[in-house]
Amino acid sequence: MLCGVFCAALTAVPVLADTEVQKYTNTDFAMDTVVSETLYTTGDDLNTAIGQKIRDIETEYLSWTDEDSQIAKLNAASGETTEVSDELAGYLEKIFQLAKDSNGAFDPTIGKIIRLWDITGENPHVPEQSELDELLKDVGYQKVSLDGDKVTLEKGATLDLGATGKGIGCDVVSDFLKTQEDVSGMILNPVSYTHLRAHETD
């Protein structure tokens, strides 16, 4: 569930029918977008912890603007081989399989193109075709090789995982909720991507 405009995932886990379920809502900001959280639980409100998990995923693995993130370090080492965490290696394996399966219609190496548009920056604009043509020579999922936890980017290639970040965040939250027996359901909506999780009642 790494990429998509809309995705719904339902997981059934037994919850006692006579237990009073509370509804908690929260609006957060992560991954450059508004995140709406609705939690149904017989326990504590976990929305703050869930929002923090999404931000942690962004800053530790995915953000190209945070120089301490693994993706930023990969981009900075373009042309060299870099060792990444098992978690990021797993994400990248799925991401590049998606790129391969789509024949490059989805391509995570468009980092330089994204920077050129500067959509979230101070000077968002539509670039000239000549500018795009110049940078397209560094685009192509084939410019990245994966060998376990070792990743090699060809010189000039730049990764941007913005298209998959929300899906990764939803997957991490889903795994976290599987460990929370008090949670009976959740709707997590980072604007362009919706994740649903429900527990079955007896």
Question: Where would I find each of the regions flagged by the language model?
Answer:
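Conserved beta-strand edge residues that scaffold enzyme active sites
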Residues: I113, S192-Y193
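A contiguous, well-ordered beta/alpha segment that forms the leading edge of an enzyme domain
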Residues: C3-L159, D175-M186
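Loop-centered beta-sheet repeat module
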Residues: G162-D175, M186-P190
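Conserved small/polar residues in nucleotide/adenosyl-binding loops
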Residues: T194-T201
